[in-house]
């Protein structure tokens, strides 16, 4: 969208009064081209891809559609859980290379799931996971105990999330204060065989620390978001053992 806006004529750009924004970045240089725009509405929750200060200076209102893609992301995360725990991508590639053999994965039933963040997506995901007979833990700086109790979710410390969970799911909103919040300190606490999933924002997770921990220990990761997107073809994340990667598609469904 941003690329198209920059390529259009000045007259056409000036005729635009509202923008429905996706994942593209709307920085000051882009906003300066949109003199007629009065509002940018983010199709999703996070608005970290929009320069809010520049928007304010330009008199542009920024809002978001909270919860609109919660189900899409929740379902995708469940897909990543099974893809990793049952080694579905690895088995597919093995067959493509002529290898027929068993891959002994793990079942989800009875596992402990840790949600790092319990907002709209976390609550939807907890509801979807409740049918799998799992134990649900959550960490949130503003815990909603009433909703959590009804969903069978127990709030614990972030340290307990990483030490106790078989599957850890990062669901925090991004802010500059939370860059690399999921650091080596927490990643090194993961239990043997644990899986961490990030479908929130790439910059929440210290990717270098993740690579180090995966190299040293038997832990797994499934990543839909990255600190820099699109992910470079030479990125070690693409070639590291025990990591599944997808190109930021968790929210991308026809319905959402």
Regions found by a protein language model. Give the residues of each.
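C-terminal helix-to-coil terminal segments
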Residues: 56, 63-76, 229-256
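Glycine-rich NAD(P)-binding loop of Rossmann-like domains
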Residues: 91-124, 133
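Rossmann-like adenosine-cofactor binding region
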Residues: 27-28, 143-236
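N-terminal glycine-/charge-rich "phosphate-binding" loop or analogous flexible N-terminal tail
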Residues: 1-18
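Phosphate/diphosphate ligand-binding glycine-rich loop within oxidoreductases
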Residues: 17-92
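Phosphate-coordination loops involved in phosphoryl transfer and adenosine-cofactor binding
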Residues: 37, 109-112, 184, 193
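Glycine-rich, N-terminal phosphate-binding loop of Rossmann-like dinucleotide-binding domains
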Residues: 21-23, 44, 170-172, 199-200, ...
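Conserved acidic E/D residue at the C-terminus of a beta-strand in Rossmann-like folds
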Residues: 140
């Amino acid at each position: 969208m941003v690329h198209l806006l920059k390529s259009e004529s000045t007259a056409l750009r000036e005729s635009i009064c509202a923008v429905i924004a996706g994942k593209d970045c709307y920085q000051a240089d882009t906003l300066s081209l949109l003199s007629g725009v009065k509002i940018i509405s983010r199709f999703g929750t996070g608005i970290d891809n929009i320069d809010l200060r520049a928007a304010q200076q330009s008199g542009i209102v920024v809002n978001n559609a909270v919860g609109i893609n919660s189900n899409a992301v929740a379902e995708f995360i469940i897909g990543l859980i099974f893809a990793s725990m049952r080694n579905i991508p690895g088995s597919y590639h093995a067959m493509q290379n002529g290898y027929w053999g068993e891959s002994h994965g793990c079942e989800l039933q009875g596992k402990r799931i840790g949600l790092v963040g319990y907002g709209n997506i976390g609550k939807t995901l907890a509801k979807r996971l409740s049918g799998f007979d799992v134990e649900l833990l959550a960490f949130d700086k503003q815990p909603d105990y009433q909703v959590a109790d009804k969903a069978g979710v127990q709030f614990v410390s972030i340290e307990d999330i990483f030490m106790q969970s078989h599957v850890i799911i990062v669901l925090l909103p991004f802010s500059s204060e939370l860059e690399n919040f999921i650091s080596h300190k927490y990643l090194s606490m993961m239990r043997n065989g644990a899986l961490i999933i990030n479908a929130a924002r790439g910059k929440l997770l210290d990717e270098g620390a993740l690579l180090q921990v995966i190299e040293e220990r038997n832990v797994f990761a499934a990543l839909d978001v990255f600190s820099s997107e699109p992910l470079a073809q030479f990125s070690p994340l693409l070639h590291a053992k025990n990591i599944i990667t997808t190109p930021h598609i968790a929210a991308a469904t026809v319905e959402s």
